[in-house]
Amino acid sequence: MKRLWQHCHAATLKGGKYSIVEDAALVTDGPLIHWIGPRAELPPDDYAERIDLDGAWLTPGLIDCHTHAVFGGNRSGEFEQRLEGVSYAEIAAAGGGIASTVRATREASEEELLASARKRLDPLLRDGVTALEIKSGYGLDLASERKMLRVIRRLGERLPATVRSTCLAAHALPPEYAGRADDYIEHICSTMLPALAGEGLVDAVDAFCEHLAFSPAQVERVFIAARELGLPVKLHAEQLSSLHGSSLAARYRALSADHLEYMTEDDARSMGEAGTVAVLLPGAFYLLRETQLPPIDALRRHGVAMAIASDLNPGTSPALSLRLMLNMACTLFRLTPEEALAGVTLHAARALGLEARHGSLEVGKLADFVAWDIERPAELAYWLGGDLPKRVIRHAEEVYRG
């Protein structure tokens, strides 16, 4: 069934560029975009429905390409500790941080995790998100990682959004493997990944490359295991120090390397040559009160696509608005509003391997878009908080209006 969506303007991101169509029209046929362009050039057709968008601005549906939305427990107490001057590393060394969430997640039932994640994700969906990634990594044993990944798959069946599932078993060292990091990495590679991938629960594999997590050599073993299973890889890299994890990710043609505050010029060059997306996470930068900025100019020089994500997690970025991350990326990291919009649409799609069907308004792609009641697209990065009036469309069907 063909629908005509008209009386609107569009920021299409067509062809990987920030492109504007004034007085636009968009035609959908089933769940796909059939035509988009200036309304004056609209070909005649027999449309089953004509929808007046009242001068709204259309953008591709927003994509949150890095979240940890499934977890048990609450770490607001650590927020208070950090305000008193305790560092992230000190909290982790005392048994807090990821370890405390692991305990709570292991104790929670699948139904409890499903219900709590749904509550967290509803604000993101109302914010215009039509696709997102959710990582495991708070289970750190086979049964608990399986539980998390099953919840992620169930969320994908229930939410009006495309959900990608990433296995982050190499997130931290579980207590039962204290002092035996190499043994745990071997367990991930020989047992956990084959089992979880064999059950169809994994779309990609991630790891945390940092002094308080895993070394580049250990991460590489995980990447090799993922490659043998035919799974793409991603990496938390250069958040707190420079271990050149982003260059390692580039060598394995990773979909993305994320955080990147301490990456070097050579790291940026490697990522640009490999086509690995840089995922910027300003929420964690802000909450941890970091001062080392990601090298945005180096990323630009080497043509590295920059995505932006919420990093929704209980410890370092309890962020429930992807649109707020646009403002943070512009204000803290000095991205332009155009770069920020591309970062939560086209480049975010690339960071998840979804760019063939998501991330821009082009013929043949899924009709996932948002109709915003704004005067110009830069307002998406300008307004702080609130729920901008909008209509969220997924697969050519309205899923939210507010």
UniProtKB/Swiss-Prot annotation:
InterPro entries: Amidohydro-rel, HutI, Metal-dep_hydrolase_composite, Metal_Hydrolase. SUPFAM superfamilies: Composite domain of metallo-dependent hydrolases, Metallo-dependent hydrolases. It is an enzyme of class 3 (hydrolase). Zn(2+) binds at H66, H68, H236, D311. N-formimidoyl-L-glutamate binds at Y138, N313, G315. 4-imidazolone-5-propanoate binds at R75, Y138, H171, Q239, T316. Binds 1 zinc or iron ion per subunit. GO terms for cellular component: cytoplasm. Pathway: Amino-acid degradation; L-histidine degradation into L-glutamate; N-formimidoyl-L-glutamate from L-histidine: step 3/3. The keyword Membrane does not apply. Its main location: cytoplasm. One of its GO terms (molecular function) is iron ion binding. Pfam families: Amidohydro_1. The keyword Transport does not apply. GO terms for biological process: L-histidine catabolic process to glutamate and formamide; L-histidine catabolic process to glutamate and formate. Its EC number is 3.5.2.7. It comes from the Bacteria. Belongs to the metallo-dependent hydrolases superfamily. HutI family. This is Imidazolonepropionase. The gene is hutI.
